[in-house]
From Swiss-Prot:
InterPro entries: Cu-oxidase-like_N, Cu-oxidase_C, Cu-oxidase_fam, Cu_oxidase_Cu_BS, Cupredoxin, TAT_signal. Cu cation 1 binds at H101, H466. It is an enzyme of class 1 (oxidoreductase). It comes from the Bacteria. Multicopper oxidase involved in copper homeostasis and copper tolerance under both aerobic and anaerobic conditions. Is responsible for the oxidation of Cu(+) to the less harmful Cu(2+) in the periplasm, thereby preventing Cu(+) from entering the cytoplasm. This is Multicopper oxidase CueO. Cu cation 4 binds at H463, C520, H525. Cu cation 3 binds at H143, H468, H519. Keywords: Copper, Metal-binding, Oxidoreductase, Periplasm, Repeat, Signal.
Amino acid sequence: MLRRDFLKYSVALGVASALPLWSRAAFAAERPALPIPDLLTADASNRMQLIVKAGQSTFAGKNATTWGYNGNLLGPAVQLHKGKSVTVDIHNQLAEDTTLHWHGLEIPGIVDGGPQGIIPAGGTRTVTFTPEQRAATCWIHPHKHGKTGRQVAMGLAGLVLIEDDEIRKLRLPKQWGIDDVPVIIQDKRFSADGQIDYQLDIMTAAVGWFGDTLLTNGAIYPQHSAPKGWLRLRLLNGCNARSLNIAASDNRPLYVIASDGGLLAEPVKVTELPLLMGERFEVLVDISDGKAFDLVTLPVSQMGMAIAPFDKPHPVMRIQPLRITASGTLPDTLTTMPALPSLEGLTVRNLKLSMDPRLDMMGMQMLMKKYGAQAMSGMDHDSMNAHMQGGNMGHGEMDHGNMDHSGMNHGAMGNMNHGGKFDFHNANFINGQVFDMNKPMFAAQKGRHERWVISGVGDMMLHPFHIHGTQFRILSENGKAPAAHRTGWKDTVRVEGGISEVLVKFDHDAPKEHAYMAHCHLLEHEDTGMMLGFTV
């Protein structure tokens, strides 16, 4: 533990006398300290600056070019307050265009930062908005169509912390970087010379880009020393394509207190916590026993994601309790969730997620050729059979029965298996259509609830489906009632071979030029067409 960290703890906890407790055992030097992003707050005139730039980072002793917001890698934690307007100047110092999307924020389309909110290379974009939503852990990342996966892989991601009066009154752990700790989890693949090795090709367009190295806040298997008592972890799955399943190595429980859009009604006790790409959960864990343990991710049954070293529980970070104790608590109740309104007479939108069968077949072949049988480890046999037959399926894989034909582009469908030129950049679909930035698929009405029915039937891939401009409630997830910790405010829902239904409402405008997006948050699916724009 570095001296400055030690002083930070001593000052924060008022324990100058803790110095003699510095033992070699407690602060084993072999693990890097968990990097803690700086808090970025608005200045006296309610402004803040974000600079998108290239830098250098070191992984396993090798230097790599990385991208970050206000630094070499990742970014600060942007602190916002409910009801308080903020102006953000975003300077793009990269040699290519980017955008900055406020993931999870309920703000107008013009400031949402989707693929239309281009910040040119060397240019600046200024956005002003007022968060009117409840306290939540959200995030920022790029959203340049066709390049989102690469720009995120290069390191662009940062947390957004929305605060409000309600959460301040709860006695939750709230000492930033001490007992209130951000945990941004990402996998990376590196080339032999240590550079981030990103490709968008047929294999990654099918299963996503995944790596064999896990980073936590940009460090490999770091350690965090925290005071005994309740430790609050703000978990973000910042991976391009890998779903996670978070647990404690000694099986101690995690108490989920918040999902994407804020507090749950009451804590939910779990021993493992699946985390889809783009999702956030806040958990409290009791470390008052003083025993060190690892936060780990358990193997998942997702195509290609149980390849070593992820075929076994894999450490995310080490948690080392200190001898001093912090004062945060786990409340019995957290907030009041509004009752779900009647679903009678609501506009229903049917969205069907699918992949060109040729991409499915060729992607699987490349995956098997590269990784052999372990590419399929953890997959159940039904999924595997569906994939293996995928290449011969042609139109059979498309389930026309459940489709909302109004959104279908039958021309594009007709080309699919009739000698149409295959282009993997346009091989993932919603309602049979590839994303078109200039053609929003529909117009939602402001302030009105809608029921969205999102189907992955006939496609066994995992699709974490994310909707911009809203925090919704899950009515059913992949054909089942949502788990208790997924009944709160969400912006991402699991679609995996089944049907999920969500209740959405949009309280801000999104004109055609700055439409909201709805898309798969497996970034390579998004970049190759599985996205739609809609207006409000």
